[in-house]
Amino acid sequence: DTPHLLNAEYIRLQYPEHVKVYEATSPDKAAQEGVALVREGHADVLMKGIINTDNLLRAVLNKEHGLLPQGNVLSHITVAQIPTYNKLLFFSDAAVIPRPTLAQFEAMLKYDLEVCRRLGISEPRVALIHCTEKINEKFPHTLDYAVLKERAASGAYGSMFLDGPMDVKTACDAHSGEVKGISSPVVGHADLLTANAVAITCNGRGVRHT
């Protein structure tokens, strides 16, 4: 609509050498155009504006013209800068996979570790988030955590620390870990909080509104 067109024109006028505006007749067309620009190497980052997420994902996941290689997993990661925490805090997956399988969880973890390392964290500290702090068959998600911990200990994910299950406070507050008697390189120093989308979405939104 007109206000957003005016905003795009304002940005173009401010940075004429760096910004090119493409017209699209619908949200789907806008998403398709953006995906095409990335595929063709004319853009490095795809950003979502006022269009709905489903419009964007239809274009990204299109088997013929999308961005996701066949057989790969699409996931989501949030990076937050929190005044009361001494470093960036990463959350995954808060949007795409509500209840990942073990294979999907491992793929997500590898993506997340790559993002952390590219942002300068050579040994990411990963907290596996859950309401309980013990592996318990009543909580199937924690059984996957046990597998991931074993693989991490064997060096499958390179130089990093991974521990859990634990709650967010324990992951980010060393005193909380001391009170609970939990000793781990991750406790109080987590770089990445990972869980299913339901848990991470709640925590991520809570942080953004704190």
Language-model features and meaning:
Residues 2-185, 189-196, 200-210:
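Anion-binding alpha/beta catalytic cores of soluble intermediary-metabolism enzymes, centered on
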